[in-house]
């Protein structure tokens, strides 16, 4: 019940052009608000640092660099986006990693607010649910540099210019 109410709330915010940034579950909620599918991925868990290719739309928003490295922890994934939405970052594991859904909605599957230490602790806490080889690969990936600051800088500008 509460998820459908949250989806309706996001749709309302979008209709009146109030800027919103969604993280992980928020990314999935925005997909539902745009009548897209969210499903448990056949690829399994995504944990650790995910490397994602930036698109031209991402550069148009002010992103820099060749890739977007960000911590993830998810099984569910967005399965499609509307034609009018802009794909910002993608990977083979998560094709719709970051999306600008409209002039006021933008979201990401990753966690720009997390530290590597938190991700490591969460993976260790979930050893009963996540396959050992997935956790080991996730822990090894934590050595990759994160792009959180640059990402959050672009998102801050997006939110402030729309406010």
PLM feature segments, named:
Residues 14-15, 54-163:
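Amide-donor transfer/coupling interface in amidating biosynthetic enzymes
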């Amino acid at each position: 019940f509460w998820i459908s109410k949250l989806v309706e709330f996001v749709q309302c915010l979008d209709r009146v052009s109030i800027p919103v940034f969604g993280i992980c579950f928020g990314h999935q909620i925005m997909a539902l608000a745009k009548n897209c599918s969210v499903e448990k991925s056949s690829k399994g868990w995504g944990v650790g640092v995910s490397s994602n290719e930036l698109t031209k739309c991402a550069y148009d928003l002010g992103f820099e660099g060749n890739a977007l490295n960000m911590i993830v922890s998810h099984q569910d994934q967005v399965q499609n986006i509307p034609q009018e939405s802009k794909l910002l970052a993608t990977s083979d594991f998560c094709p719709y990693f970051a999306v600008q859904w409209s002039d006021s909605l933008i979201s990401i599957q990753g966690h720009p607010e997390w530290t590597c230490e938190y991700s490591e602790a969460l993976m260790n806490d979930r050893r009963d649910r996540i396959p050992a080889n997935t956790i080991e690969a996730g822990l090894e990936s934590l050595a990759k540099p994160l792009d959180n600051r640059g990402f959050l800088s672009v998102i801050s500008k997006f939110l402030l210019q729309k406010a």
